[in-house]
Amino acid sequence: MNLKKYLSTAPVVATLWLFLTAGILIELNRFFPDSLFY
């Protein structure tokens, strides 16, 4: 159960959140290009 405690620490959660956000932005840019520039 030590792994679960490690996975819930702040740096790990922040890293996962950054990867998730970057992945969503990349996929949005792939399907809808130039949507970030009006």
UniProtKB/Swiss-Prot annotation:
Give the organism the record lists. Cyanidioschyzon merolae (strain NIES-3377 / 10D) (Unicellular red alga)
- Chain ranges passing through the membrane: 6-26
The free-text function statement in the UniProt record for this protein reads: May help in the organization of the PsaE and PsaF subunits.
- Kindly list the organism's lineage: Eukaryota, Rhodophyta, Bangiophyceae, Cyanidiales, Cyanidiaceae
The protein's matches in InterPro entries, at most eight in alphabetical order, are given as: PSI_PsaJ (IPR002615), PSI_PsaJ_sf (IPR036062)
Q: Which gene encodes it?
A: psaJ
* Keyword Membrane carried by entry: yes
Identify this protein by name.
Answer: Photosystem I reaction center subunit IX
Q: What is its main location?
A: plastid
Alphabetized, the UniProt keywords read:
Chloroplast, Membrane, Photosynthesis, Photosystem I, Plastid, Thylakoid, Transmembrane, Transmembrane helix
What compartments host this protein?
Plastid, Chloroplast thylakoid membrane
Gene Ontology terms, cellular component aspect? chloroplast thylakoid membrane; photosystem I
